[in-house]
Amino acid sequence: MEYFSVGKIVNTQGLQGEMRVLSVSDFTEERFQKGARLALFDDKDRFVQEVEIASHRKHKQFDIIKFKGMYHINAIEQFKGYSLKIAKENQGKLAEGEFYYHQIIGLEVYEKDQLVGEIKEILQPGANDVWVVKRQSKRDLLLPYIPSVVLCVDIEKHRVDVEIMEGLDDED
């Protein structure tokens, strides 16, 4: 079975079995809603068990969650540093023009049919995602995911067409 990361447990929160999670999902309300089923993976990325979300709330930059049946700090303290993942078949469908990160990472980036590089990471610094493009013999290129820069994403062809606006590439 294939799984995709939705967050990492960074600490416990209080004594009642709550955990602080750093989310890596754009769908936190859906992923962490009561009754949602996720897989727990240890710090060596080994499957541990499936868990069900009992509660979810936001606190500062964290998602605070509690697992069903684990209502005390002693039951969950061992999970610090573990990852929460969703099974591929539970991801759900996206609207036209929306993509999961795992679909974007690894795509080749072209500007006017000239290969620029390959997307190696996606950052979330603010209003827009930023795609990190690994280039040969140059520093990584940071591309904001905005319509004037990212012109076309073709998952089937493993290709992204972009227009690198002046000022985005400091090596030109």
Swiss-Prot record:
This protein's UniProt keywords: Chaperone, Cytoplasm, Ribosome biogenesis, rRNA processing
A GO cellular component annotation here is: ribosome
Q: Which GO terms describe its molecular function?
A: ribosome binding
Give residue ranges for domain PRC barrel: 95-168
Q: Does the keyword Iron apply?
A: no
Q: State where the protein is found.
A: Cytoplasm
User: Which domain of life, per UniProt?
Assistant: Bacteria
Q: Which InterPro entries match?
A: PRC-brl_dom (IPR027275), PRC_barrel-like_sf (IPR011033), RimM (IPR011961), RimM_N (IPR002676), RimM_N_sf (IPR036976), Transl_B-barrel_sf (IPR009000)
**Main location per the UniProt record:** cytoplasm
Its BP terms in the Gene Ontology are: ribosomal small subunit biogenesis; rRNA processing
**The keyword DNA-binding appears for this protein:** no
In which family does this protein belong, per the annotation? Belongs to the RimM family.
Comment on protein domains: The PRC barrel domain binds ribosomal protein uS19.
Subunit record text: Binds ribosomal protein uS19.
Q: What does this protein do?
A: An accessory protein needed during the final step in the assembly of 30S ribosomal subunit, possibly for assembly of the head region. Essential for efficient processing of 16S rRNA. May be needed both before and after RbfA during the maturation of 16S rRNA. It has affinity for free ribosomal 30S subunits but not for 70S ribosomes.
Which PANTHER family does the annotation name?
RIBOSOME MATURATION FACTOR RIMM
Any idea what this protein is called?
Ribosome maturation factor RimM
| Annotated source species | Streptococcus equi subsp. equi (strain 4047)
- Tell me the name of the encoding gene: rimM
